[in-house]
Amino acid sequence: MEHFATGSIETHKDSQRKWIRDKGPVVESNMGWIEVYIDPENIRAYFEGWVAIVDKAKSEKFQKLVQNSEQVIPLLPWPKQMEKDHFLAPDFTTLEVIAFATDSCPLGINIPNYDDIRDNEGFKNVFLGNSAKSYAISAMQFATEEQSKILSDNTPRCYEVHVACHELLGHGVGKLIYRGADGKIPHAFVDPVTGESFESCYEQGEDWNGKFGPISTSYEECRADTCGFYLCTLREVHTLFGFDGDNEHEIKTMLWVNVMNQFRKGILGLQMYNRETSKWGQAHTWGAYVFS
């Protein structure tokens, strides 16, 4: 309430610190001006406030992913020096949303967005179970009758794995590399695609949003999505969610379902594109369109 009365960012940051330290609650809630996704300039955040009940039973599989994260993170296709020195294992729960006051209800949330808190104190992940159910129903657009049957039967279970990897290991991994006081890049990084050494990094005082400007949030969503699609195919990950790692058809179906849902999101995202200004009004949909 003090934050709403004064507008103090530090007060809101303190509330987020208390929130991430509240591990394993029965009731979850959070509010504030959190995301900047619908501002083309990525500056003005919009309000969201929600209250939900934690589904303890369904949360177990997400906690397994958290517990195994230190074994999964090294499987990502980039140098280990680009990862945090220590992964701050977050709370990861499945929620049944009671009320969500905002423009739309997402499938998963990874907050707070304050980089200093995320890097040094941690964050929380939540999967919105009843939001995912409605998403599965709407996923039938742009599909044939046969495809609709596959999507209807498999979207909740398959997309759950993608969202889990997207939130925990997409948004939750990696760090910004800053040039040292001696003017050198602190590690000899090699581009995993080209094999060439990196010659640039962040300068002191720079950050992600400032460096990439209007594309920063969409770029971040692309990063998280590609992590999700890559990781969900790994035995070390999908078996945690009950998939049979030896069943090639099941794993191919999961990847197909997840990619098809992404294509759908990219097509629907055109609703958020302003032809007059050549700008997108939502970061997730722009990222999905680029991916598509």
Language-model features and meaning:
Residues 105, 114, 133, 168-170, ...:
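Short, glycine-/Ser/Thr-/acidic-enriched flexible segments
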Residues 156-169:
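Short alpha-helix carrying the canonical HExxH Zn2+-binding catalytic motif
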Residues 1-159:
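Contiguous, non-catalytic segments that form substrate-binding/exosite surfaces or channel walls
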Residues 51, 141-158, 181, 204-217, ...:
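Glycine- and acidic
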Residues 171-183, 234-242:
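Secondary-structure transition/capping motifs at alpha-helix termini
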